[in-house]
Amino acid sequence: EYAEYYENEKVFKSKGYTKVITSDKYIIEGSDIVIDNKKKIINSKKNSKILDQDKNQIYLENFEYLIEENIFKSIGNIKITDINDNSFEFSQIYINTKKKEVLGTDIKAFMNDDAFKIHPKNKPRIFANSLKLDNEKNIFNKGIFTLCDFRKNDKCPPWSIQSTKILHDNKKKT
């Protein structure tokens, strides 16, 4: 809607809806975005959406993008919806756009894959302390997995599997 450029500081500030495309072809949509060409940082303290090269959607309350390192950082309510409609929620995230790698904490992953669902009522999910996700492997640390449907009053599922490390190999599907 409106933008200002401060030539001495090499800072571009937008007001209202703004769309930015990074060198790695990530699309940032948000408002009140600041591009600091001296510090090589793009950031916003407003709700934003990032679309990656694989069409995964990343929703953030705020973000900082380190241009030279190709890294997005965010703290707050973060949600990723992938192309298979799986949902990942985080409290903190780092995304390396060169390596196509995601590191996050306080992860809640809700899987939509029918291969997990023995019964239509199944709600496969993994909650973990942290996640490292890339094209080859997903590694959940200190995680708990269940297929069970949600229970009233946020009760624990009737069964679950816990592990210090849960590994999913995307290529081998194991």
Segments predicted by a language model, with ranges:
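Structural signature for solvent-exposed beta-strand/loop edge elements and short helix-capping sites
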Residues: 1-174
